[in-house]
Regions:
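Glycosyltransferase-associated regions of secretory-pathway enzymes
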Residues: 1-148, 166-256
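Active-site acidic Asp-centered loop
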Residues: 159, 164-166
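Small-residue hinge/turn detector
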Residues: 149-159
Length: 256
């Protein structure tokens, strides 16, 4: 119990520190200090305040970017040969057995779609990512987990297709309709505290080349890391998708 409590306290301190560093004292006050009244638990109130503080910060600071994409519409896929993207940074030979099994299952059920395994050695062949982001990954300022969020948006923006996390096991042929949607993800009928509310899943995401969501998220990530050195929240990708769903009609239609 003591170890769990200490972990929770440390995580809470990290959350507040990151919000303070990126979004300032006002959002820390709203998130962690402002008193609350009513029947909701302190935990629920804190979670909701944290989510609202992060959304407010992002929507305020990236308002011009949001406006840029407000009227853009999704473009239907132009090819039935859309690629499939998966990443294992160290390469296939370094995959642990469970990841190898997942990768083989993906290749076996890809149909006519070419599976591209992105690694540290071949990434520059497929996608262009700013040097300042790659440098911050090397410096440890950007975790590899978050870098993979950036990577999937960049790949889908440049090439379109379907991103699947390396730890997803595919048990049957991927339906062609997945590749025919301008924006594809999966939803789950579950209760969750995540800002996504299980309306989308980042581990599987499909898009047309230069699709609205991936274009918006890619550009926001680029602008964010050009000036920041800390990740505002572990689930930043979900906050970005939430903002897109709220403000961009084409994304909202696809995720409804």
């Amino acid at each position: 119990m003591k170890i769990k409590l200490i972990r929770k306290i440390k995580q809470r301190i990290r959350d507040i520190s990151n919000v303070w560093s990126v979004a300032g004292i006002r959002n820390v006050y709203v998130m962690a200090i402002l008193p609350h009244f009513g029947s909701k638990s302190t935990r629920d109130i804190r979670r909701e305040r944290k989510q609202q503080a992060i959304l407010h910060y992002l929507q305020t600071n990236y308002q011009n970017l949001i406006l840029k994409y407000t009227q853009k519409e999704e473009i239907p896929p132009a090819s039935n040969q859309a690629p499939i993207w998966v990443c294992w940074w160290q390469g296939e030979n370094a995959m642990p057995p469970i990841v190898q099994s997942c990768f083989q299952s993906l290749c076996s059920h890809a149909g006519n779609h070419l599976v591209h395994l992105i690694t540290q050695e071949n990434i520059s062949k497929y996608v262009t990512i700013p040097d300042y982001i790659l440098r911050k990954v090397q410096e440890g300022k950007i975790s590899f987990t978050h870098f993979s969020d950036i990577l999937r948006m960049c790949l889908l923006y440049e090439h379109g297709g379907l991103w699947i996390d390396a730890t997803v096991y595919v048990s049957q042929l991927i339906p062609e309709k997945v590749f025919q949607e301008p924006l594809f993800t999966v939803a789950a009928n579950i209760d969750t505290d995540n800002i996504s509310q299980a309306k989308w899943m980042g581990f599987i995401l499909g898009s047309s080349p230069q699709g609205v969501l991936c274009s918006f998220a890619r550009e926001l990530f680029f602008q964010y890391w050009e000036k920041e050195n800390k990740l505002l929240d572990y689930f930043l990708i979900d906050y970005v998708i939430s903002i897109a769903k709220t403000n961009l009609a084409s994304v909202r239609r696809s995720l409804t």
